[in-house]
A protein has these predicted regions:
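Structured loop/turn residues at beta-strand edges in well-structured enzyme cores
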Residues: 9, 44-46, 63, 101, ...
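Hydrophobic/aromatic residues within transmembrane alpha-helices
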Residues: 14, 51, 64, 122-124
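Alpha-helical structural signal
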Residues: 26, 83, 94, 120, ...
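An acidic, glycine-rich surface segment that forms the CoA-thioester-binding/catalytic face
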Residues: 30-38, 65-112, 154
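Crotonase-fold acyl-CoA enzyme core
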Residues: 98-179
Length: 179
């Protein structure tokens, strides 16, 4: 499965599970994540969540360039129920990008490698971020002539110094966990 959702006592763990693809987001993965997040919010036994990526190379590299991005841009039609949910259910994109979806429990990001584009946008919606020394962060969309879709233009500048946020957003350059 592209998402592993486990519960242990009061802790929910969400693991993006596509390590060979740097945990890139596909329609199926974002739908499963949205559904798991809804379960997390609604389960009174759960008190904290941990969001991570499988493997040690990437937390999440963002949207899958072959499936997710062509679907959202309209370059390919919906071919299955996962695709249709992404396009027709606003909840799916709101919850999976951790924006416009209220979570009243702490959500911790355990960042174990590259955290790019949509992956970084998800992290902006978490409460605590713990990054491995080798983690890198970037919003490289500007290099493709597009902007981040999940609110990073606003959320990033509210969470880090404005000048640093502008540099990241306007250059697409990566920063390391150490920086």
């Amino acid at each position: 499965l592209p998402l592993l959702y486990t519960k242990s006592g009061a802790i929910a763990t969400f693991t993006l599970n596509r390590p060979a693809a740097r945990n890139a987001l596909t329609p199926e993965l974002v739908c499963r994540l949205a559904d798991a997040l809804r379960d997390f919010v609604e389960d009174p036994a759960l008190r904290v969540g941990i969001l991570t990526g499988a493997g040690d190379k990437a937390f999440c590299s963002g949207g899958d360039l072959g499936t997710m991005l062509p679907l959202i841009s309209g370059d390919r039609p919906a071919t299955d129920d996962w695709d249709r949910r992404v396009l027709e259910e606003p909840f799916v994109m709101a919850a999976s990008s951790l924006r416009d979806f209220p979570i009243d429990k702490p959500l911790i990001a355990a960042i174990n490698g590259a955290c790019m584009a949509g992956g970084m946008e998800m992290v902006l919606g978490t409460d605590i971020r713990i990054a491995a020394d080798h983690a890198v962060f970037a919003l490289p969309e500007v290099r493709r002539g597009v902007i981040p879709f999940a609110g990073s233009l606003v959320r990033l500048a509210r969470q880090i110094p404005h000048a640093v946020a502008m540099e990241l957003l306007l250059t697409g350059e990566a920063v390391t966990a150490v920086q």
